[in-house]
Amino acid sequence: MKKFSLFAILLGFNIALGACSDDDTTPVVQNEIFQLPEKAYVLAEQSRRAIVIRDAETNRNIWSWDPYTACVPAAQQGWFVNPSEVKPVFNRRYILMTASGGAVALIRLSDHKLMFYANCGQNPHSAEVLPDGNIVTAESKNGEISTFVVDTVKVLGAKANTVKLGNAHNVVWDKKRSYLYATATITGGVTALFRFKYDGNRSNPKLTNQTRIYTFDKESGGHDLFPVYGEEDKLWLTAASAVYKFDLTGVTDATTNDSAEPTCEKVYNTADIKSICNGPDGILMLKPTEEWWAEGLVNEKGEELFKMDG
């Protein structure tokens, strides 16, 4: 059995998935120019530190990447242990990934080229692209939100600046308001939503004006924070006991100094969902069946929608 985390682009859906599956023996062509299909699953194959793209129509693996064939120096290959998030960015032409061993990386799909990578800490969960092309990551072990200058000539990078945020698991950029959002665990063990401004300094990127904008009374373990399809002012949040929606309608843009809070609605009383997204055809969730991963996706009713072979 193999461990996977999976990011799916299928019928308008985007989601991270953990799955356990046997090997797929279909060969993956490495020397052709690649374009991401409209319906595809982008998987982080934790057993061999790899990323695999699987065509959702044919159920065949059509693209793969790993730090060994990419000639990552041996001393840094351990950074890519247990990929934790993989997602298409820049109009689906690149993959942005994090791995529990510490890696954050940007990979070009067309030719498998590693464009940028760095170490962002002991247990990163998520990364996001900032407006100028720099990258920000969330790392839970030390509770850090870190920025990186993306230099595709040097390729290997390092942290530029870091702010502390306990049990950081997610980062989402709000293009409309020019804020970065992330959740954290605060005193008392409850989850809170924070926002940051980005200073836009391409060569020395910093997050500023850290502000707590929503605090749960009892909820803990904030995990996945992700935009709601079809509702530009809303974000999904999965946590220890339920699934929520934040409504940011009353939050003005970063040019003001207001302290408006979002509203929050409990949507599903479903515990320990690792990832969620929605699209034209409904809702996808990852509900772990073994530790942090599962063999497939379910909908909001718990009905199986997708399952890996094996």
Residue ranges and their predicted role:
Residues 4, 14-34:
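Bacterial Sec-dependent N-terminal signal peptides
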Residues 42-47, 89, 96-101, 136-141, ...:
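Conserved beta-strand positions in repeat-built beta-propeller and related beta-rich domains
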Residues 56-61, 149-154, 196-206, 247-258:
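Short loop/turn segments immediately following beta-strands, especially the blade-tip
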Residues 61-77, 112-118, 156-163, 209-216, ...:
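A short beta-strand motif characteristic of beta-propeller blades
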Residues 65-126:
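Blade-loop segments of beta-propeller domains
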